[in-house]
Amino acid sequence: MSPQTETKASVGFKAGVKEYKLTYYTPEYETKDTDILAAFRVTPQPGVPPEEAGAAVAAESSTGTWTTVWTDGLTSLDRYKGRCYHIEPVPGEETQFIAYVAYPLDLFEEGSVTNMFTSIVGNVFGFKALAALRLEDLRIPPAYTKTFQGPPHGIQVERDKLNKYGRPLLGCTIKPKLGLSAKNYGRAVYECLRGGLDFTKDDENVNSQPFMRWRDRFLFCAEAIYKSQAETGEIKGHYLNATAGTCEEMIKRAVFARELGVPIVMHDYLTGGFTANTSLSHYCRDNGLLLHIHRAMHAVIDRQKNHGMHFRVLAKALRLSGGDHIHAGTVVGKLEGDRESTLGFVDLLRDDYVEKDRSRGIFFTQDWVSLPGVLPVASGGIHVWHMPALTEIFGDDSVLQFGGGTLGHPWGNAPGAVANRVALEACVQARNEGRDLAVEGNEIIREACKWSPELAAACEVWKEIRFNFPTIDKLDGQA
């Protein structure tokens, strides 16, 4: 042993490895109002006790490392360390546990989702002592929430900008998603908007490819917006995807959209990254643009029940980072989505205060302290027969987005848009008259078909279409 090492040992530094639970498992800890709280689904390797696994998560996502280091003595671990303060079993899963971890607020940079996630969902997810790890929920304290701008505008400001109230908004993703020229793309946008939709949308992978450069697309879509507005007397929009290979290029595209006078742009927030998304959100607030968010890549992160991150966490992160709309599944369409879980994170997107409710997957009470809300977007494999269920599930503060369910109409895009608008108006009127959409939905649609040939044709085309597959990511305790 060198003299230097002997000196360190003689003043209290004890080298070596000790169990994480001796430092980071603190069941007596009382959480603070300023703590960020996390609920992890932990699957320990065989032979690893749940207390050690939970403590390892707390350590490796905060101040700990695999061995004792002498620099621990140069700071206050009690002030900065994460703490596993409670562990509970998962019903029906012998090898899984929910570990609750509290993080001191000083561990995180203000206004940075990037920094928060780098710690909480960083290297710890590759830790060998864990067979699997999933972040189920986060409690963001008001003290941290107040360091974020959040959505550029929010639900009420968007409705005021669009002058549209008392119903869900209607959208359509232009198909085929790739391969159209800019002029043909703009024509498809125009037909949908003049038929009665509020919005059309770039698909998430439409950026600036050889068949359609972004500037050309923006110009033809702006022409479609202005022409359809003049004909219908309604404010229209198209989600112009500003996502690009660099933040500088992304902002350049948003600037051009603003110069064209269009109301909304779009970003792929997971593939683009949280830093880019927050930058774009700030630009949109400063320049009066709404911001639509697509969640491409989310299922890589959130679909498996025992590893990754639940979408409710990604939804909370988006509300902090900023976006006025975000795709949130449909429950009834072609994409994965458990009903109760979906309703839970839809409330987390829209409401100012959400109580803990484990029956909907909400582990913590969340106070958003007046941070603007986000409109959930229902999109993916939906058509006119789904309209009653969508209206009942998502309510007025939502965007119902039909891609193939508009463009697949046998008579073309505009009649497809008419069919969706008629179906929506019929459902809203029936609901306002006190009818039960869950029970009478099909009857309501059939009645509307009698005076709308466009809706009748759509109903005939999609009458047999179902996406009846079991949900992979169910809430605990569901069969």
UniProtKB/Swiss-Prot annotation:
<feature type="binding site">
    <location>
        <position position="204"/>
    </location>
    <ligand>
        <name>Mg(2+)</name>
    </ligand>
</feature>
<feature type="binding site" description="via carbamate group">
    <location>
        <position position="201"/>
    </location>
    <ligand>
        <name>Mg(2+)</name>
    </ligand>
</feature>
<comment type="subunit">
    <text>Heterohexadecamer of 8 large chains and 8 small chains; disulfide-linked. The disulfide link is formed within the large subunit homodimers.</text>
</comment>
<feature type="binding site" description="in homodimeric partner">
    <location>
        <position position="123"/>
    </location>
    <ligand>
        <name>substrate</name>
    </ligand>
</feature>
<feature type="modified residue" description="N6-carboxylysine">
    <location>
        <position position="201"/>
    </location>
</feature>
<keyword id="KW-0602">Photosynthesis</keyword>
<keyword id="KW-0601">Photorespiration</keyword>
<keyword id="KW-0120">Carbon dioxide fixation</keyword>
<dbReference type="InterPro" id="IPR033966">
    <property type="entry name" value="RuBisCO"/>
</dbReference>
<keyword id="KW-0597">Phosphoprotein</keyword>
<protein>
    <recommendedName>
        <fullName>Ribulose bisphosphate carboxylase large chain</fullName>
        <ecNumber>4.1.1.39</ecNumber>
    </recommendedName>
</protein>
<dbReference type="InterPro" id="IPR036376">
    <property type="entry name" value="RuBisCO_lsu_C_sf"/>
</dbReference>
<dbReference type="InterPro" id="IPR017443">
    <property type="entry name" value="RuBisCO_lsu_fd_N"/>
</dbReference>
<dbReference type="GO" id="GO:0009507">
    <property type="term" value="C:chloroplast"/>
</dbReference>
<dbReference type="Pfam" id="PF00016">
    <property type="entry name" value="RuBisCO_large"/>
</dbReference>
<keyword id="KW-0113">Calvin cycle</keyword>
<feature type="modified residue" description="Phosphoserine">
    <location>
        <position position="208"/>
    </location>
</feature>
<keyword id="KW-0503">Monooxygenase</keyword>
<keyword id="KW-0150">Chloroplast</keyword>
<feature type="binding site">
    <location>
        <position position="203"/>
    </location>
    <ligand>
        <name>Mg(2+)</name>
    </ligand>
</feature>
<feature type="active site" description="Proton acceptor">
    <location>
        <position position="175"/>
    </location>
</feature>
<keyword id="KW-0479">Metal-binding</keyword>
<dbReference type="GO" id="GO:0019253">
    <property type="term" value="P:reductive pentose-phosphate cycle"/>
</dbReference>
<dbReference type="GO" id="GO:0016984">
    <property type="term" value="F:ribulose-bisphosphate carboxylase activity"/>
</dbReference>
<dbReference type="Pfam" id="PF02788">
    <property type="entry name" value="RuBisCO_large_N"/>
</dbReference>
<dbReference type="InterPro" id="IPR036422">
    <property type="entry name" value="RuBisCO_lsu_N_sf"/>
</dbReference>
<comment type="similarity">
    <text>Belongs to the RuBisCO large chain family. Type I subfamily.</text>
</comment>
<feature type="binding site">
    <location>
        <position position="327"/>
    </location>
    <ligand>
        <name>substrate</name>
    </ligand>
</feature>
<keyword id="KW-0460">Magnesium</keyword>
<feature type="modified residue" description="Phosphothreonine">
    <location>
        <position position="330"/>
    </location>
</feature>
<feature type="binding site">
    <location>
        <position position="177"/>
    </location>
    <ligand>
        <name>substrate</name>
    </ligand>
</feature>
<feature type="active site" description="Proton acceptor">
    <location>
        <position position="294"/>
    </location>
</feature>
<dbReference type="InterPro" id="IPR000685">
    <property type="entry name" value="RuBisCO_lsu_C"/>
</dbReference>
<dbReference type="GO" id="GO:0004497">
    <property type="term" value="F:monooxygenase activity"/>
</dbReference>
<keyword id="KW-1015">Disulfide bond</keyword>
<keyword id="KW-0456">Lyase</keyword>
<comment type="function">
    <text>RuBisCO catalyzes two reactions: the carboxylation of D-ribulose 1,5-bisphosphate, the primary event in carbon dioxide fixation, as well as the oxidative fragmentation of the pentose substrate in the photorespiration process. Both reactions occur simultaneously and in competition at the same active site.</text>
</comment>
<keyword id="KW-0560">Oxidoreductase</keyword>
<dbReference type="GO" id="GO:0009853">
    <property type="term" value="P:photorespiration"/>
</dbReference>
<dbReference type="InterPro" id="IPR020888">
    <property type="entry name" value="RuBisCO_lsuI"/>
</dbReference>
<dbReference type="InterPro" id="IPR020878">
    <property type="entry name" value="RuBisCo_large_chain_AS"/>
</dbReference>
<dbReference type="GO" id="GO:0000287">
    <property type="term" value="F:magnesium ion binding"/>
</dbReference>
